[in-house]
Amino acid sequence: MTETSIWHEVQKFEIVRNFSNKLWNACRFLYPQLEQAGALAAELPMDKSLFALEDKWILSRLQTTIKDATRMLEEYHFAELAGFLYRFVWDDVCSSYLEIKKAVINSETLTAEKKNAMAILSYVLKNVLDLLHPVMPFITEELNSILFQGSEMVISRAWPKADESLIDAKIEAAFDQAFAVVESVRGVRGRYNVSPATKLSAVVSVDDAATEASVKDCMAIITELSGLSDLSVAVKAAKPKFSASAVVPGGELYIPLEGILDPAAEIARLEKEIEKAKAFAASIEKKLSNQKFVSGAPEAVVNAERTKLATQMDIIAKNEKALEELR
């Protein structure tokens, strides 16, 4: 086994460790709230009349996830199943739904809205533990014994079945679009070194009225997850002056940076970063063009240099795009 393959194996362990922690923390987040309510997770009923848009979304996503996971299991695609469930738990359950509902579930007053959010999260997590059990049997049983005290072991339960009545493809598509906008806002923050604490305004220029309505339905969620102070949506909206832009499904995102950044200083910073990255890339290219180095150095060392070069080329491309936007 080479040094590179050993490193890749270590990385896999770290990924699974981090995922296990993420799942554990999601269950730990809910548990004290259940204690406060004096209820077991399995006892909480869901009230459909109180479903918010994000509740309908996560419940629909869960049903489609159950259907896809069932197919993968029946076809013995265990690696595909593990990766698929990883993304659902990490991205949809933890990074999206939990972030949206955190304030509601953490509130001191036990309102009907809080009870319903807890019931939905309990239902989602119970199904998550069932779905993950074939690939993570030990931690799923442990979490089940804590969160669903008194219920049967996961291994004894029937495999989850999708509830077709909860599937809403339109809502799932709307949220896919909303999360693409959120990721684009975060990408702009990263490109221009804008702190997550800094409130930004944004304009989403869409191609048609249907897309406009879809984005507007999710405006509150986009604003909250992106750290925006203001969000406007319009068909063929004009690009504001001194704005960063990003392509999103069905349109384009504009983020005005006037008042956030000093135009001249930011252009100078980007030019300096590009110059620095180009110089570094040139030195790496020179090293990699030396056949004596490539053939004589350990494979891991050569691969590390190639990775460094790819990183510098990525920095150059991103900064050149950012520079083009500001000019």
Label every model-predicted segment:
Residues T2-R327:
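Feature 926 captures the class I aminoacyl-tRNA synthetase adenylation module centered on the KMSKS loop
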